[in-house]
Design a protein with these regions (language model features):
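Non-catalytic beta/alpha edge segments that cap or flank active sites
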Residues: 1-119
Length: 119
C-alpha cells in the first residue's frame, strides 16, 4: 500500500463500517520513499498496541539483522486491531507464528468478552 490517503480510507472503512476484529496489512513498512503503511496506520489509530510489532521485530531479529529496518506498527481503532506485517511471504508466516497464539485473548479483550488478564 503505497498511497497513504487510500490506505487510511480503507483502514477506516474496514474498522468502522465492517467492524472487523482484525486487519492485517502486508508490505510498505521499510525505508523506501513509497513505504507509507506505518504512517497511514498510525493516522487512523485510537490507541497504540506496540507490543505486537515489538514481539514480531524481536523474533525476526533472531532470523535476520535486517529486521531492525522494519517500521511496522500495531494499533487499535475502536474495537479493531490493526497489525502491519512485512511484504515477504516468508516473513509474514514467521510473524504470524509470533502473534497469532495471542489473538483470541487480545480480540476477546477488545470485544469486552475477556475479563481475566492475569493469566
Amino acid at each position: 500500500a503505497d498511497d497513504a490517503a487510500a490506505l487510511k480510507t480503507t483502514l477506516t472503512r474496514l474498522a468502522d463500517q465492517r467492524q472487523l476484529d482484525l486487519i492485517l496489512t502486508t508490505g510498505g513498512t521499510g525505508f523506501g520513499p513509497r513505504d507509507v503503511t506505518p504512517e497511514a496506520t498510525m493516522a487512523v489509530a485510537t490507541r497504540l498496541a506496540p507490543g505486537i510489532a515489538e514481539a514480531i521485530r524481536a523474533a525476526s531479529l533472531a532470523i535476520t539483522p535486517r529486521a531492525m529496518l522494519s517500521r511496522a506498527v500495531s494499533v487499535i481503532r475502536g474495537k479493531t486491531l490493526i497489525v502491519n506485517l512485512p511484504g515477504s511471504p516468508k516473513a509474514v508466516c514467521e510473524s504470524m507464528d509470533v502473534f497469532l497464539p495471542q489473538m483470541p485473548h487480545a480480540l476477546g479483550l477488545l470485544r469486552g468478552e475477556v475479563r481475566d488478564c492475569a493469566r
